């Protein structure tokens, strides 16, 4: 049976139609529809604010009422600025949108990311991180069982033994980078270091991931795949907002012209590289040696323990982003922060030049125990984490306890790197670059070091952590041994004031470089 409001609405429409004024009728229908939408929106906001299961969590009024402010921030690439401000204002537990909570403490890392026997895993949000265009999983987007399989297959490449195998390759490209910088040193002009670091790291990951360089340093220009990666990630952010609104099919029509086809371009580079790699026989000393043994070059031997061809493709794309952009960002951040703090730069340079008499002495192994250099990297990752836009996890069926409170199933939850590391209740003088805090913990006894997890925790933590640390230490050590570096403040501005779409949209970093006396 129809309700009284339905009958009244129908009667009103019939009355309008009987007047014969079609234009007035259309306007009236539009007005009624608009009023209904407005009423629905107001009712939804009231529910979200006062009756939703997450209503007790603090957060900014408009963000608790509607997901619209969140979507706008995501599209603008300014979410990290909001998280930093909100967590400082509202504390370590924050309601970021009606169905999402953001945390800024150590306990949340354990409750959300750590393995708990008998409890289902908090999987990554499938709306924020959908499957690749071919519909196949990767180490980044997979269920628990398949993630373990991918992790096992790539585990050898990122082990200590694998790192020793890759040492010669990484050293070779670090030395090539020193030669490239020599061309622009002492010319009286500033050098844009983002491009140079990208070239060095991208060539290195090319050799490690596919057995061949991208030849960026040889050609003295950025490979187009780097641009495709950034455009793809920006288009993914737009697609996510459209997907959350149920109108993802409209995405191609909404995307700016320069972003259309970005995802396809990104995967086309991966397809070409992985196909070329699979044609090579014998061990190449790269990430794929064990995968191919288990799977065959075309995935034809995959019995459930290897990978299909589609999985190889998706993982290749993930490895390039994870192994290049993140390390390049850390190198840029460390160089900028050191140049901003001459006393810290002096300490880092003193440690490096005091230990090594020649560049040949600087190897992956010899830089392992560089105390101050490692502290510089750790403090850089606190102030400028390589993956600032970490996707949230989804609370499993039945709900779970996070930070001592029950959280309903399907709620999005996550730990904000930026929100955590800049919160004054977690780190003393949190906006200052102080590498010493990672050497002498008594310097700031109230600092919450357990909340500092730039590589994440649990079974899905960064598989390339050891490789990244080794590469960062090596390239920074060689660069600071060979060159005196000062910041061109006028051309650079505030380098850390950047937007993010999953990774940093890095602004230009201008440095003046001169060959050090010990390198002449």
Curated annotation (Swiss-Prot):
Residues binding heme, per UniProt: 462
Family listed: Belongs to the cytochrome P450 family.
EC number(s) given by UniProt: 1.14.19.n5
EC class: oxidoreductase
Provenance organism: Dothistroma septosporum (strain NZE10 / CBS 128990)
Swiss-Prot/TrEMBL keywords: Glycoprotein, Heme, Iron, Membrane, Metal-binding, Monooxygenase, NADP, Oxidoreductase, Transmembrane, Transmembrane helix
Membrane topology: Single-pass membrane protein
Protein name as catalogued: Versicolorin B desaturase
GO molecular function, one term: heme binding
Expression induction: Expression is positively regulated by the dothistromin-specific transcription factor aflR.
Principal subcellular localization: membrane
Function (record text): Versicolorin B desaturase; part of the fragmented gene cluster that mediates the biosynthesis of dothistromin (DOTH), a polyketide toxin very similar in structure to the aflatoxin precursor, versicolorin B. The first step of the pathway is the conversion of acetate to norsolorinic acid (NOR) and requires the fatty acid synthase subunits hexA and hexB, as well as the polyketide synthase pksA. PksA combines a hexanoyl starter unit and 7 malonyl-CoA extender units to synthesize the precursor NOR.
InterPro entries per record: Cyt_P450 (IPR001128), Cyt_P450_CS (IPR017972), Cyt_P450_E_grp-I (IPR002401), Cyt_P450_sf (IPR036396), Cytochrome_P450_monoxygenase (IPR050121)
């Amino acid at each position: 049976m129809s309700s009284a409001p339905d009958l009244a609405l129908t009667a009103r429409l019939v009355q309008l139609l009987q007047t014969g004024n079609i234009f007035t009728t259309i306007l009236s229908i539009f007005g009624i529809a608009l009023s209904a939408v407005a009423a629905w929106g107001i009712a939804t906001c009231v529910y979200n604010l006062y009756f939703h299961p997450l209503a007790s969590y603090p957060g900014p009024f408009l963000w608790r009422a509607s997901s619209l402010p969140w979507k706008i921030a995501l599209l603008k690439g300014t979410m990290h600025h909001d998280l930093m401000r909100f967590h400082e204002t509202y504390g370590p537990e924050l309601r970021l949108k009606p169905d999402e909570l953001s945390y800024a403490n150590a306990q949340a890392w354990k409750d959300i990311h750590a393995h708990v026997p008998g409890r289902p895993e908090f999987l990554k949000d499938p709306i924020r991180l959908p499957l690749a265009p071919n519909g196949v999983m990767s180490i980044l987007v997979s269920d628990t069982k398949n993630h373990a399989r991918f992790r096992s297959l790539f585990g050898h490449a990122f082990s200590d033994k694998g790192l020793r195998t890759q040492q010669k390759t990484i050293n070779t490209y670090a030395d090539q980078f020193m030669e490239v910088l020599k061309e622009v040193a002492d010319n009286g002009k500033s050098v844009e270091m983002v491009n140079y670091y990208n070239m060095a790291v991208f060539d290195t990951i090319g050799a490690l991931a596919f057995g061949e360089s991208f030849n960026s340093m040889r050609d003295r220009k950025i490979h187009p795949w780097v641009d495709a990666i950034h455009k793809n990630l920006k288009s993914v952010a737009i697609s996510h907002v459209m997907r959350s609104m149920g109108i993802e099919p409209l995405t191609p029509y909404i995307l700016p012209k320069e972003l259309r086809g970005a995802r396809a371009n990104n995967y086309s580079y991966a397809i070409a590289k992985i196909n070329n790699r699979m044609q090579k026989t014998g061990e190449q000393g790269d990430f794929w040696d064990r995968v191919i043994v288990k799977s065959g070059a075309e995935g034809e031997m995959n019995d459930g323990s290897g990978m299909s061809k589609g999985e190889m493709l998706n993982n290749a794309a993930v490895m390039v982003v994870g192994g290049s952009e993140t390390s390049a960002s850390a190198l840029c951040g460390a160089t900028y922060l050191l140049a901003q703090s001459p006393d810290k730069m002096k300490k880092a340079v003193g440690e490096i030049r005091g230990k090594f008499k020649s560049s040949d002495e600087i190897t992956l192994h010899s830089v392992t125990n560089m105390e101050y250099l490692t502290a510089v990297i750790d403090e850089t990752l606190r102030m400028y984490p390589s993956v600032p836009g970490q996707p949230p996890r989804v609370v499993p069926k039945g709900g779970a306890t996070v930070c001592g409170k029950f959280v309903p199933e399907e709620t999005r939850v996550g730990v904000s790197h930026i929100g955590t590391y800049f919160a004054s209740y977690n780190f003393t003088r949190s906006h200052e670059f102080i590498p010493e805090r990672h050497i002498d913990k008594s310097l700031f006894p109230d600092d919450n070091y357990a909340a500092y997890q730039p590589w994440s925790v649990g079974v899905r933590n960064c598989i390339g952590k050891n490789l990244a640390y080794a590469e960062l230490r090596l390239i920074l050590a060689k660069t600071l041994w060979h060159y005196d570096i000062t910041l061109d403040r006028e051309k650079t501005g505030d380098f850390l004031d950047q937007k993010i779409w999953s990774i940093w949209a890095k602004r230009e970093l201008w440095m003046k470089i001169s060959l050090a006396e010990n390198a002449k």
